C-alpha cells in the first residue's frame, strides 16, 4: 500500500472556483485510478489561492492481473472469421483452445492483462486530468498548448511507502513533476522538498501557508469576533463572504479599522453592501444601535508595523467608495423629499423594458397595482393603500443607489418612501414585496405587503405563461418556480382563501389558468413533500373541487395524510379499493353505472344491513364536516366506516346468483365510493 500526494501549484486561482476545483481533482483522479484497477482507502482535497492539493491514502502498489475469456468462432469456420478473432484478441492460432459445446467445437481465447505499477497509472491519469480539467474559464500562456485557470508553475506528485518516497515522473508542456513546493509568496517564497502529506502540511504551515480552507475560515472568524468583542462590537455574520475571503489568502491576518464619522449616518445596509462588494470587508456593528461603526479586512501577510500601512491604505480606498455611496444616497433623498417624490422615478421606468413581449416596467407596475387592489380585500388590506404601495414599490429601480447596488432594491425603496412621508404600510411593502425570495426567507405578514407581494409574483407568472415562456427541465431563466413557491408560502403562511384561477384571469388576459394551476400543484407537491405529505395524498386532494384554493387543499391533505397513517385509514383504503375495483369491473361488464342507490328490502346478510346503517349514519355527518371544512371530523366519520366495510367483505359475496341482490349490492358499493369520494379521490392513493 502507498499514499499519493499531488499538488498543482499556479498563480492565484479565483476564490469562487477553488472548492469546485478541489472536488473535480479528487473525483477525476479517484475515478481514473479505480477504473485502471487501483483502489484506495480514502481521499481528500484541499485548496489555497495558489494550489490544488489531493491526498490519497491506502493506494494499491500495482493494478491486479486480469484474465479475460472470449468465445470465438466455431472450429472449421471461414479463415477470415478466425483471423479477425485473433486480431481482436491479440493472440496466435496456437494460443487458442478448442472446446466442445452443444453447438459443436468452438475456439476460446484466454487473454491475460498483467498488472501495472501504480506510478505508471498515476502519471497517465494525472496527465489526462490536467489536460482536460473542467475550469469554468481557462487560459493559455507562453508558447504552450496547455489550458489552466492561471499559469501552472509546478506539479508535485509523490508516492510514499514505508521504505520511502518516489516522485511519479510526469511532464506536461514543460512542467515536470517533482517532490518540492513553495511557501507563502512574500513571507517564505523559497522552494523545499517534502516526503509525504504530513511532512508537506507541516512544512507549509512553517512557511506561512494554512492548507485547509476550513481552518482559514475558522481562524479569520475567531480573530475577527475577538477584536470586535474587545471594542464592544460584533461582526455581521456573512458565511459567503467568509468563504470567499478564505480563498483570497494563504496566511490570514485579521485587521480592524474605523469608518470615517461622515459616513456613519448612511443606512447600515448601504455600508455593509459597499464594503462587501467593493472591498471584501466584514461589517462590524454596535449591537445596541445597529449602526455599522468599523470594518474587518483580512491581509495575506504579517508586516513589521502590524498591518498599520495596510489598514491605512484600505481606509483611504474605503472612504472614496463610501463617498460615492453618500453622494448617491443624498441625491436620492433630495428627489424623494421633493414635490415629485418617489413617483418622479416612475416616468423613467416607461423606458425600461421588462420583457420585449410583456412591455415596460411602467406597464407592469400598472398591472401589479390593479391586481393588488383586487387581492387586497382577500388578505384584509386597504385597497387604496395596496394600490398606492404597488405603484411606488419599484420606483427605487430608477434611483442612483439601486443602479450601483441592485441587491438593495426594495430596501432602498422603503427608506425613500419613508423620506417622502408615505404611510408606513406602503414603505414596508416597498421592501417586502420581493419576499419570500427562497425557501428559508421570511414571509411577509402585513396585509398591504402580502397583497403587493402576491400581485407582483402572480403578474410575473401569468405574463410568462401568456407568452409561453415556461420552465423546461432544469432551465428556468425567469425564476418562475421560485415565484410560484413564493405565492404558495404567502398564501399558506397568511391563511389566504382565494381561488387562484379567478386571480389568474384578472392578472393577465390570455394566460392559461388550468396549465398554470397544474404548475402550482407540482410546486406544492415539492413543498409539502418536505413536510412529510405523500405526493399521492396530495393528488387525491387535487382531484377534488376547489383545488385552486391552496389553503383548503393543504388543510384537506394534512388531515388525509394523518388518517392514512392510522390503522383505520389503511384498512378503509383497502376496503374502498376493493369496492371500487369490483364496481368498475361490473360496470364495464354490464355496460351500466350502478349509482341509483341500494334498497334495504333486498338485504340478506346482517353485515350488509350493518353497512347500510353505517353509510346512512355517517354520510350526512361527513358531508356536514366537509362543508364546515372540519376535515378531522370528516376523517372521523370515515374511520367509523372501517369496521362495517371490513365485515361486509368478510361475510358477503357481492356477485350473487340472484341478479336483483347482485345489483343491490353493487349499488351499495357505489354508495361506499360516493361517501368516501366526499373527502378525497382515494383511487389515487397508492397501497
Swiss-Prot record:
Q: Which Pfam families match?
A: DALR_1, tRNA_synt_2f
Which cellular compartments is it found in?
A: Cytoplasm
A GO CC term assigned to this protein in UniProt: cytosol
Q: Identify this protein by name.
A: Glycine--tRNA ligase beta subunit
An annotated GO BP: arginyl-tRNA aminoacylation
Q: Which reaction does it catalyse?
A: tRNA(Gly) + glycine + ATP = glycyl-tRNA(Gly) + AMP + diphosphate
Similarity comment: family membership: Belongs to the class-II aminoacyl-tRNA synthetase family.
The principal location of this protein is cytoplasm
Q: What Enzyme Commission number(s) apply to this enzyme?
A: 6.1.1.14
Q: Native species of this protein? A: Ruegeria sp. (strain TM1040) (Silicibacter sp.)
Known PANTHER family for this protein?
Answer: GLYCINE--TRNA LIGASE, CHLOROPLASTIC_MITOCHONDRIAL 2, GLYCYL-TRNA SYNTHETASE
* Keywords assigned by UniProt, alphabetized: Aminoacyl-tRNA synthetase, ATP-binding, Cytoplasm, Ligase, Nucleotide-binding, Protein biosynthesis
Tell me the subunit arrangement.
Answer: Tetramer of two alpha and two beta subunits.
GO function terms (MF aspect): arginine-tRNA ligase activity; ATP binding; glycine-tRNA ligase activity
Task: Note the InterPro entries from the entry.
Answer: DALR_anticod-bd (IPR008909), Gly-tRNA-synth_bsu (IPR015944), Gly-tRNA-synth_heterodimer (IPR006194)
Q: Which PROSITE patterns match?
A: AA_TRNA_LIGASE_II_GLYAB
What SUPFAM superfamilies does the database record attribute to this sequence? HD-domain/PDEase-like (SSF109604)
Amino acid at each position: 500500500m502507498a499514499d499519493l500526494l499531488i499538488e498543482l501549484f499556479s498563480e492565484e486561482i479565483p476564490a469562487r472556483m477553488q472548492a469546485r476545483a478541489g472536488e473535480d481533482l479528487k473525483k477525476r483522479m479517484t475515478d481514473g485510478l479505480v477504473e485502471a484497477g487501483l483502489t484506495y482507502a480514502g481521499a481528500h482535497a484541499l485548496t489555497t489561492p495558489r494550489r490544488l492539493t489531493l491526498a490519497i491514502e491506502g493506494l494499491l502498489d500495482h493494478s491486479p492481473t486480469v484474465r479475460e475469456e472470449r468465445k470465438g468462432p466455431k472450429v472449421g469456420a471461414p479463415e477470415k472469421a478466425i483471423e479477425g478473432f485473433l486480431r481482436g484478441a491479440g493472440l496466435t492460432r496456437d494460443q487458442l483452445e478448442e472446446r466442445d459445446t452443444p453447438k459443436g467445437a468452438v475456439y476460446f481465447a484466454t487473454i491475460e492483462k498483467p498488472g501495472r505499477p501504480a506510478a505508471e497509472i498515476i502519471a497517465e491519469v494525472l496527465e489526462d486530468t490536467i489536460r482536460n480539467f473542467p475550469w469554468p474559464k481557462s487560459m493559455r500562456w507562453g508558447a504552450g498548448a496547455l489550458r489552466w485557470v492561471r499559469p501552472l508553475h509546478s506539479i508535485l506528485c509523490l508516492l510514499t511507502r514505508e521504505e520511502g518516497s518516489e516522485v511519479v515522473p510526469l511532464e506536461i508542456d514543460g512542467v515536470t513533476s517533482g517532490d518540492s513546493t513553495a511557501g507563502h509568496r512574500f513571507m517564505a517564497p523559497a522552494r523545499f522538498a517534502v516526503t509525504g502529506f504530513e511532512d508537506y502540511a507541516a512544512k507549509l504551515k512553517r512557511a506561512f501557508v494554512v492548507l485547509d480552507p476550513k481552518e482559514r475560515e475558522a481562524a479569520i472568524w475567531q480573530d475577527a469576533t475577538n477584536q470586535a468583542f474587545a471594542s464592544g462590537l460584533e461582526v455581521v455574520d456573512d458565511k459567503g463572504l467568509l468563504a470567499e475571503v478564505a480563498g483570497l489568502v494563504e496566511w490570514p491576518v485579521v485587521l480592524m479599522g474605523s469608518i470615517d464619522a461622515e459616513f456613519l449616518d448612511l443606512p447600515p445596509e448601504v455600508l455593509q453592501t459597499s464594503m462587501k462588494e467593493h472591498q471584501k470587508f466584514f461589517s462590524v456593528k454596535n449591537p445596541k444601535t445597529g449602526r455599522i461603526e468599523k470594518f474587518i479586512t483580512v491581509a495575506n501577510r504579517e508586516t513589521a508595523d502590524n498591518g498599520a500601512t495596510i489598514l491605512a491604505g484600505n481606509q483611504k480606498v474605503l472612504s472614496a467608495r463610501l463617498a460615492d455611496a453618500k453622494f448617491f444616497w443624498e441625491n436620492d433623498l433630495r428627489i424623494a423629499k421633493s414635490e415629485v417624490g418617489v413617483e418622479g422615478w416612475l416616468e423613467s421606468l416607461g423606458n425600461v423594458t421588462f420583457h420585449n413581449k410583456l412591455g415596460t416596467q411602467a406597464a407592469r407596475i400598472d398591472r401589479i397595482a390593479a391586481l393588488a387592489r383586487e387581492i387586497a380585500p382577500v388578505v384584509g388590506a386597504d385597497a387604496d393603500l395596496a394600490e398606492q404601495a404597488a405603484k411606488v414599490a419599484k420606483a427605487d429601480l430608477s434611483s442612483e443607489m439601486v443602479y450601483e447596488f441592485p441587491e438593495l432594491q426594495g430596501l432602498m425603496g422603503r427608506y425613500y418612501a419613508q423620506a417622502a412621508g408615505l404611510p408606513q404600510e406602503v414603505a414596508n411593502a416597498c421592501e417586502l414585496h420581493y419576499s419570500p425570495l427562497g425557501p428559508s426567507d421570511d414571509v411577509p405578514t402585513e396585509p398591504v405587503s402580502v397583497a403587493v407581494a402576491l400581485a407582483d409574483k402572480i403578474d410575473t407568472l401569468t405574463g410568462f405563461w401568456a407568452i409561453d415562456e415556461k420552465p423546461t427541465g432544469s432551465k428556468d431563466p425567469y425564476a418562475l418556480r421560485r415565484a410560484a413557491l413564493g405565492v404558495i408560502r404567502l398564501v399558506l403562511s397568511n391563511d389566504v382563501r382565494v381561488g387562484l384561477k379567478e386571480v389568474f384571469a384578472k392578472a393577465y388576459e390570455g394566460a392559461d389558468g388550468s396549465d398554470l394551476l397544474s404548475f402550482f400543484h407540482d410546486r406544492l407537491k415539492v413543498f409539502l413533500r418536505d413536510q412529510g405529505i405523500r405526493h399521492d395524498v396530495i393528488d387525491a386532494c387535487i382531484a377534488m373541487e376547489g383545488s385552486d384554493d391552496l389553503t383548503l387543499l393543504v388543510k384537506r391533505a394534512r388531515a388525509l395524510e394523518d388518517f392514512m397513517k392510522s390503522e383505520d385509514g389503511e384498512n378503509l383504503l383497502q376496503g374502498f379499493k376493493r369496492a371500487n375495483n369490483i364496481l368498475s369491473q361490473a360496470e364495464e361488464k354490464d355496460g351500466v353505472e350502478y349509482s341509483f342507490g341500494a334498497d334495504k328490502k333486498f338485504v340478506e346478510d346482517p353485515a350488509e344491513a350493518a353497512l347500510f346503517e353505517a353509510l346512512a349514519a355517517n354520510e350526512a355527518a361527513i358531508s356536514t364536516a366537509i362543508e364546515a371544512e372540519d376535515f378531522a371530523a370528516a376523517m372521523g366519520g370515515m374511520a367509523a366506516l372501517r369496521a362495517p366495510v371490513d365485515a361486509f367483505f368478510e361475510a358477503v359475496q357481492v356477485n350473487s346468483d340472484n341478479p336483483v341482490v347482485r345489483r343491490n349490492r353493487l349499488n351499495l358499493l357505489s354508495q361506499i365510493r360516493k361517501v368516501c369520494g366526499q373527502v378525497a379521490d382515494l383511487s389515487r392513493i397508492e397501497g
